[in-house]
Amino acid sequence: MGKIFYIMGKSASGKDTIYKELIEKIPKFHSIVPYTTRPMREGEKDGVEYFFVDQERFDEMMDEEKIIEFRSYNTKCGIWTYFTADDGQIELWQYDYLVIGTIESYYALKEYFGDDVMVPLYIEVEDGLRLSRALERERAQLKPQYAELCRRFLADAEDFSEENLERAGIKRRFQNIDKETCMEEILREINVNL
C-alpha cells in the first residue's frame, strides 16, 4: 500500500518551493493535483499547482460525487473553493504520493484514507519572517491583493492553532528557516516512512 506524504503550512512558509524540490529529488512520487475555483496567479500553470475550474464545474463534480473534500473561503476577491477529487489520480496500490494542502484537507484525507496512509509534513516559519516573505511575493504580482494577504495571514493563525494541529495528529514540525536544513530533515522523514 502506498503512502501520501502531505506538505502543509501557513501561507509563505515555503511549501510550494519544498514541494517542487521534493518532486525533483524523488521522481517516483506521484502528485495529486488539487482543484480550485480561485483565479490563477502569475507563474502558475493549470494542472500543475492546481486544476483551475469555475463554480459550475465544481457543482458538477459534487453532483457526480467525485469530491473527497473541499473548503471554501470568503476572500476579499469573492468565494474561492479548494478541493480534492476522486478523479482517477490516486492509485495507492501502485504509487506513493506527494501532496500539498491545508490542515483541513489533510484531516479529511486522513479520515478518507486512514492513518496508515497519511504522513504529515508540517512546515513552520516564524510569523515575522513569513509575513515578510508573503509581502515580497505579493509585490511581485501584476495586481497585488494586499487585503487578501492580510486575511490569509490572520486565518492561518486560527487554521494552524495548536488545538487543530493536535486534532490532526501532527506531532513533528519542520522549521523552514534554512531551506537546505529543512529539506534534509524532510527527506529523512520520508525515507523512514517509505
Predicted regions and their residues:
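Walker A/P-loop
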Residues: K15-D16
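P-loop (Walker A) phosphate-binding loop of NTP-binding proteins
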Residues: K10
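Hydrophobic anchor at the beta1->P-loop junction of P-loop NTPases
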Residues: I7
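ATP-dependent small-molecule kinase phosphotransfer cores
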Residues: R38-Y97, G101-I103
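Conserved phosphate-donor/acceptor-positioning beta-strand/loop module used by diverse small-molecule
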Residues: D96-T102, F113-R137
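Small-molecule kinase domains that catalyze NTP-dependent phosphoryl transfer to phosphate-bearing small molecules
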Residues: R139-I190
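Short beta-strand-centered segment that lines the nucleotide-binding/catalytic pocket of NTP-utilizing
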Residues: K28-R41
